[in-house]
C-alpha cells in the first residue's frame, strides 16, 4: 500500500482512544526460545487464552510463522480468530504493529514507527530486530491501509496512551531515553507526536514501573479509562522501589490539565507481588548472545494496568495473587458498562510484558 509523505494531522486523521469501537485486535504468536521458556509452549497457552477471551467481544487476527502455523491453528480453534502468516522476531505487537489513525470519513490508516527492540545496541533486548520493524507495514498491507512511516524516529505503542480528545500520556524514562531518539529534544519529540497522532497536550510522567525492561512503558503503569480519568499503578509501601515512582507520577497527574483544560481524576490500582521468576522458569529459557538474561533475583514488573479495552469488555491479567480480586473490582468499578475477564498473565510477564503489550487494537472506521 501507499506510503504517504504527509502526516496524519495534516490529512485530518487522529489516534482514537482505546475504548473507541474496534474492527479487530491483532496479536503475534510467541515462539522465540531465548525469551519464552520451554520453546514457547507455556506462553502459547497463555496467548491462546488471551486470544479466546478477546474473541468473545471482537475478531482477532494472530500473526504466526510458517513453522508454527499448524500448531497455532489447532490451538486457536475459534471462529472469531483468523491466522495470517507473518515472519517476526518476537510477539510484542503493541510495540511492533502500527498505531492506527482514523478520520471522520470512514478511513483507517496506520503509523509505522521505527522499532529498535527497546534500545538498539544501547540496552535493547534482542538483535536482530529488522523483521519486527517490518511488522507494522505487513499488517497495513494485509488490511489495505495507507502508511505513514517515521523513518529514524523510534517509538513503541506501549509507550503512549491517548484519551482521543487531544491528550497523550507517556514517560520521560522511555521517550527521553538516550537509546530511543537522542538526536531530538523533548519539544521535538512532542512535535512528532502532535503531527502523527493529532494530539495537543503531552503529559510527561517521570518514570514507569520499577524494573520494566522496556525503560518504563506507560501502558504498564498508567492508562486512561475515559477522558479526564486515569488509572495509576500504586503502592503505599514506602519500602517498595515503586513507591517514589508512584508518588512522582501522582504529583504530575494532580498538577496538570489536559487538552480540554480538565484536572485529572486519578484511580489507584494496587501493584501485585512482588513477583519473581522461579529457578525452573528461568532455566527453561534458552541462552543466546544479545538476548535478555532471565534471573530469579530480578523482580518482575507485574501490573494490573496492563489490560486491553475491547468492544464491551476488559481483558486483564491475573497473577494468582491476593490482590487479583481487588483488581477485578476496581476495573469493574471504573468500567461499569464493560464485562471484565481476567486471564492468567504470569507466563506473559515472564517474557517481559502483559496483555496490553501483546495486543494492538484496530479501530473501526468512523463516519461515511
From Swiss-Prot:
The enzyme class is hydrolase
The entry lists its GO molecular-function terms as:
agmatine deiminase activity; protein-arginine deiminase activity
Documented EC number(s): 3.5.3.12
Pathway in which the depicted protein is active: Amine and polyamine biosynthesis; putrescine biosynthesis via agmatine pathway; N-carbamoylputrescine from agmatine: step 1/1
Recorded catalytic activity of this chain's protein? agmatine + H2O = N-carbamoylputrescine + NH4(+)
Which InterPro entries does the record associate with it? Answer: Agmatine_deiminase, Peptidyl-Arg-deiminase_porph
Specify the superkingdom: Bacteria
Family note: Belongs to the agmatine deiminase family.
How is this protein named in the record?
Answer: Agmatine deiminase
The gene designation is aguA
